[in-house]
Amino acid sequence: MEVHNSLHCTAPVLSSLQASASGSGTPKKTAASSAAAQNSKQLLDQLSQQQKAQEEAETHSRRDCDSPASSNSEPEKDLDELRDLNGSLTGSGSVGKSNGSLSGASSTTSAPAGTSTPGSANTNGSASGAASLSVVSATAHLKKRITSSRTPTRKAHRIKFYRNGDRFYPGITIPVSNERYRSFESLYEDLTRLLEENVKIPGAVRTIYDMVGKKITALEELEDGQSYVCSCNNENFKKVDYNTSSQPLANLTLANNSRTSSHRLAKLQRPASPLKNGVPNSIAPVPVGGGAAANGSPLNTSRFSERDSVVHPRIVTLIRNGTKPRRIIRLLLNKRNSPSFDHVLTAITQVVRLDTGYVRKVFTLSGVSVLQLSDFFGSDDVFFAYGTERVNTVDDFKLESEEQRAINAIRKTLRTAGTACKGPKPKMPVKSKKAYPPGELKAQAEAQLQASAAPANEDEEQAALLKSTGVEVAELPAAIRDNYTLSQIIGDGNFAIVLKIKDRQTGIPHALKIIDKSKCKGKEHYIDAEVRVMKKLHHPHIISLIMDVDQDTNMYLVLEYVSGGDLFDAITQVTRFSESQSRIMIRHLGSAMSYLHSMGIVHRDIKPENLLVELDDFGNVVQLKLADFGLACEVTEPLYAVCGTPTYVAPEILLEVGYGLKIDVWAAGIILYILLCGFPPFVAPDNQQEPLFDAIISGVYEFPDPYWSDIGDGVRDLIANMLQSDPDVRFTSEDILDHYWTMGNEEIGCGDYSR
């Protein structure tokens, strides 16, 4: 049965009321019948409008809809109810449909003329009144049904999304339909916003995969009740066991006023370091949603406080149960993958890949069973991983010579015991005035040695540098010339010079960087990238960009001014810093890097020359800021360009196997080493490039006495984890901030690596 585009009433639907009006002549009954007829007419008009709206929606929308039969049956049911009511009112009636029109006729057998009696009149009047009330009541009921959503539209799919590669994130569920999202871009934007509220992501969502890694290219491919994986910055699909058992799909909502406990839990399991945004360590991080008070669970409070007091970033060595010699793997544990004992077992399962499946039992090297979270962060750093198989306590805990050699090789760079330094004290590299872009790093050769010759008169050198730029005061942009006064040159590089300037109104000093475009032909994209990146950055430990003016010959950048100069000069003056001073600087540097990396930006040229410091009256460093973003870029895939400064370059850059954000952590580890002893961990005779690169690739270095004899094990452990040759187990920037030495909690300790 089909309802067509319009509904036309060709005859009075309630003709019985008209017939009774002529037969009885009762005014009361006539009025009631007229009201009922009017209500019925209004009802039919609304049904007609509803049907027209339905057809328009079907014409303009080519989407999957609810069953037409079920949708069309609703108006038919309404008409049937109306017919029944009319029939009960008149005793007989019909409502017919033909060619999209409704026709109705009814007749009433009334008393012959002149035989009307008071009794019959009362009966007819009461019947008519009751029928009228029934029609009015039915009309009101049907109006409610009409106002409800009966227009067939596509039902929104409830779809769960996971973060790519994150096996601990419980996922987030949203309704998806073509009405809600007109394009993939709008869905990407919404997913980016929602994921940022629950978990740290490296950038915007750019790709969606199904659970087997197939790329989704259209909204129609998303199926109701299914789960999908969101990928940021076009990263490849990571096949892991996603947390599909965290909560039933039907129970998850996105209502802002009813966030589920799993969402709060997801954020609590990934606490941002209190140092990440420059907040002092003394200020305890406040859990999202009010912490324990928000979820009302003292158990959660105790569990997370235990994690915060026990868990600190560290690398553990895992021996996979199997045929000897057994496979040995390293794993980085931190607050993001180790919020609980079960999470650690899951992380171990992913890397050891037992034939029997999930890791069920873990033992220390001495055969002691690991039963709680704190056992992974004690003095032991080597563990045996077992599934459901039986443990042979006699043979399994004995290491073969090949296994022992492999573990000793891993521990070699984790030794805290100093070795005597042979020969003279190594020297700091000569201060570099330039960062070497791709293709120029290895061609540097011995230019740094020659640069150590005494310069000419400083004033003459500055005048020559200023003249070499071809910039006259009159040529400066009006926005700079009218608002600032020029002062001395405070720095120079390969493509630019930096002058100190002052605001004419406030007297506040700033730095003016003048980039000569003629000196960087073919490298203009580095200038554009520097400006583009700096415009995005707002952090207390990153130099701020105040103004940029682009002209045909030069690019002008007005930057924040830091009075203490760069860290290289500070190291030259004091040779080495105390642990407390070094802690302040690595906190600030780690905070800046963590901020950059959270935005998917890698600096690629972190070195003392690009770190500016503020000093107090006693010459102590009170603040450090990261500067010079000439090589910075956004990471959307592995990078291969060989660039940076030789002393601070990471091994994966030299090996040209692809690198990412963690090259900045390596450079920061080199700097921390230098701060404490006055020379870098990797040196070569006469600063020769190839031997230096070979030493970096080997990853072997020492903490030689007497230069390290008074330096504690905590900072050595941090350096060892920052200078891991394998990027997968190297600390992240947040791990630097979470390390017990950085936080000043050295009583926690991290085990003895001297054995």
From Swiss-Prot:
Record's catalysed reaction(s): L-seryl-[protein] + ATP = O-phospho-L-seryl-[protein] + ADP + H(+); L-threonyl-[protein] + ATP = O-phospho-L-threonyl-[protein] + ADP + H(+)
Span of domain Doublecortin: 157-243, 314-397
Compositionally biased region (Low complexity): 18-52, 100-128
GO terms classed as biological process: intracellular signal transduction
Domain of life assignment: Eukaryota
Gene3D superfamilies the record matches: Doublecortin domain, Transferase(Phosphotransferase) domain 1
SMART domains noted in UniProt: DCX (SM00537), S_TKc (SM00220)
Pfam families: DCX, Pkinase
Region entry Disordered, spans: 18-128
Record carries keyword Ribonucleoprotein: no
Active-site residues from the entry: 605 (proton acceptor)
Compositional bias annotation for Polar residues: 87-99
Broad enzyme group: transferase
Keywords on record: ATP-binding, Kinase, Nucleotide-binding, Phosphoprotein, Repeat, Serine/threonine-protein kinase, Transferase
Family: Belongs to the protein kinase superfamily. CAMK Ser/Thr protein kinase family. CaMK subfamily.
Protein name: Serine/threonine-protein kinase GL21140
Lineage: Eukaryota, Metazoa, Ecdysozoa, Arthropoda, Hexapoda
